[in-house]
Each structure stands twice: as C-alpha cells, then as structure tokens.
Regions:
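Structural/interface elements that position substrates and couple domains in central-metabolism enzymes
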Residues: 1-93
Length: 93
C-alpha cells in the first residue's frame, strides 16, 4: 500500500490548512495539492510523520532523511514501526 490507500491523505489535508506539507512515497510521484519531498530545496523540517512505513524509507532513514531534520525535530511514527530504533524526539501511538 501507499499513502493514497491510507488515512494519510486525510491527515495531510488537515495539516495543510495551517502548515507547509511535503510528502514522500516511493510509489507516488505526484499528489494534487502537495509538493513531493524530492522538490524540497529549502531549510530543514520541524516535524516528520511516518504514516506508511515502506522498507525503502526505513532503510534510508539515517542517510537520506535525517539530514533534512532540524535539531529538535519531532518524529511521529504512526504505526510504531521504528520503536526499536534510537530516534531523538520520537513519538508513536
């Protein structure tokens, strides 16, 4: 499954009302109303929400995604896929 087949879109629409939202899903290149993280060329993120834990994302977390996070970034892991990892400011359901 990808983010289009989950409640992720509802969450993104809600957050997009007051915040700048970027998405990343290895199976989705374009999503109307949102910018793909691949287009991101600015400063770092205040928060990250992992809603669909693709193997590719988890495998590349340190190398590809961690450099995009601010020092005190909050990392929300909706499904708790990374509970066993040591992640600063980690939050899960």
């Amino acid at each position: 499954p990808d983010l289009r087949n989950s409640k992720s879109i509802d969450l993104m629409n809600f957050l997009n009302k007051k915040h700048h939202i970027y998405f990343y899903d290895p199976f989705v290149k374009k999503l109307e109303g949102f910018k793909n993280l691949i287009e991101f060329k600015s400063s770092k993120f205040d928060a990250v929400i992992l809603s669909v834990p693709h193997t590719n994302i988890i495998r590349n977390l340190k190398n590809k995604f961690e450099p995009l996070l601010k020092e005190n970034c909050i990392f929300f892991d909706i499904k708790g896929s990374l509970r066993s990892k040591k992640i600063k400011n980690y939050w899960s359901l």
